[in-house]
């Protein structure tokens, strides 16, 4: 992605299928507090390599409004995000969706309930014709080492402790930054 301006949308939680770029909304989805969404936005900004691309960070007011309709008159999330990027003067846009964010119950040494996260990062080419170029998906619930020995690498990478939902989401952000080339 040389010499392109990349818009970064704030984290949103899709609650209707028309808002999704892919995937589905889980049954019994719980709303994610605005404070948590803001914390995710702040963390994601720190993960981006500002020497690689020119970034334009969109605000909540930049993305407010109904979905744009496509040529057939249907509400279309892809066209909507591309339009928001173009309005910001960007060639591409990264759209982070957080479908589920479950905070750990307990402390770092022991948890009654583990942190869990389900997030997607979409790279959309906003130039006509609009196109979804890439998706990075991260869905994980931390497991104890006793329950899942296959996760020993993650266990040691996390310092042998129970992580918060924000820390777990940060792992998904790292994955997206690498996969998408941000």
Model-based region annotation:
Residues 103-108:
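Extracytoplasmic/secreted cell-surface and envelope-processing proteins
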Residues 12-97, 126, 130-134, 166, ...:
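N-terminal segment of the mature soluble domain
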Residues 1-16, 84-88, 111-114, 118, ...:
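C-terminal/domain-edge helix-coil "capping" segments
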Residues 21-23, 109-112:
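Short, glycine/charged-enriched secondary-structure capping and boundary segments
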Residues 99-101, 122:
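Short glycine-rich beta-strand segments
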């Amino acid at each position: 992605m040389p010499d392109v301006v990349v818009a970064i949308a704030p984290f949103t939680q899709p609650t209707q299928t028309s808002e999704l770029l892919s995937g589905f909304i889980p049954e019994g989805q719980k709303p994610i507090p605005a404070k948590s969404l803001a914390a995710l936005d702040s963390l994601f900004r720190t993960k981006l390599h500002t020497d690689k691309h020119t970034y334009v960070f969109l605000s909540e007011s930049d993305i407010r409004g109904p979905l744009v309709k496509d040529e057939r008159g249907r509400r279309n999330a892809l066209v909507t995000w591309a339009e928001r990027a173009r309005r910001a003067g960007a060639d591409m846009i990264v759209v982070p969706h957080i479908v589920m964010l479950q905070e750990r119950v307990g402390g770092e040494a022991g948890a009654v309930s583990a942190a869990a996260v389900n997030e997607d990062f979409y790279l959309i080419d906003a130039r006509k014709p609009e196109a979804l170029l890439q998706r990075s998906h991260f869905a994980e619930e931390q497991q104890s080492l006793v329950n899942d020995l296959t996760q020993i690498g993650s266990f040691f990478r996390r310092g042998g402790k129970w992580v918060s939902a924000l820390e777990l989401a940060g792992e998904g952000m790292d994955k997206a930054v690498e996969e998408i080339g941000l």
